[in-house]
Amino acid sequence: MARFQEFYRETVVPKLIEQFGYKSVMEVPRIQKITLNMGVGEAVADKKVMDHAVADMQKIAGQKPVVTKSKKSIAGFKIRENYPVGCMVTLRRGQMYEFLDRLVTVALPRVRDFRGVSGKSFDGRGNYNMGIKEQIIFPEIEYDKIDALRGMNITITTTAKTDDEARALLAAFSFPFKN
């Protein structure tokens, strides 16, 4: 069992029950999935860029990403329908907790001039979105072997009904919020 999964069961659940007064353990919000999405617009000109992005994402997530394709042709962006434009990974259960552990304890502290993540990036339904500007903050990526700095979106989907519940859940996992 992942370290954060055990931590959730033994520490976070009792803390949230006390804070919000839930009657059942099943009412306590939990993290359903973490989705990593990397848009690779440069892949239109050079197909190797997509291969590098997929390889980086696979190292970070520990799981093979799905290549996302364009839904329709857009002449201004020089893309046609079904062109590869990005890649994404959905993490659940053990791998999700392992990734969250690495994100909070290793990756985020390695961000340059890091002062915490925004507490305003909740969507109103208890889900949290954040962006990362460069993939080199993850220890799995070797700085010498990357071809370009690429960012990614990280979406944390929870069962929380409100943003306050989701914020309390992520704060219990020692998520570094600014405000």
From Swiss-Prot:
Intrachain S-S bonds: none
Signal peptide stretch: none
Alphabetical GO biological process terms: translation
InterPro entries attached to this UniProt entry: Ribosomal_uL5 (IPR002132), Ribosomal_uL5_bac-type (IPR020930), Ribosomal_uL5_C (IPR031309), Ribosomal_uL5_CS (IPR020929), Ribosomal_uL5_dom_sf (IPR022803), Ribosomal_uL5_N (IPR031310)
Keyword tRNA-binding: yes
GO molecular function, one term: tRNA binding
A cellular component annotation (GO) from this entry: ribonucleoprotein complex
Keywords attached to this entry: Ribonucleoprotein, Ribosomal protein, RNA-binding, rRNA-binding, tRNA-binding
Subunit structure: Part of the 50S ribosomal subunit; part of the 5S rRNA/L5/L18/L25 subcomplex. Contacts the 5S rRNA and the P site tRNA. Forms a bridge to the 30S subunit in the 70S ribosome.
Recorded family membership: Belongs to the universal ribosomal protein uL5 family.
Function: This is one of the proteins that bind and probably mediate the attachment of the 5S RNA into the large ribosomal subunit, where it forms part of the central protuberance. In the 70S ribosome it contacts protein S13 of the 30S subunit (bridge B1b), connecting the 2 subunits; this bridge is implicated in subunit movement. Contacts the P site tRNA; the 5S rRNA and some of its associated proteins might help stabilize positioning of ribosome-bound tRNAs.
Name of protein: Large ribosomal subunit protein uL5
Gene: rplE
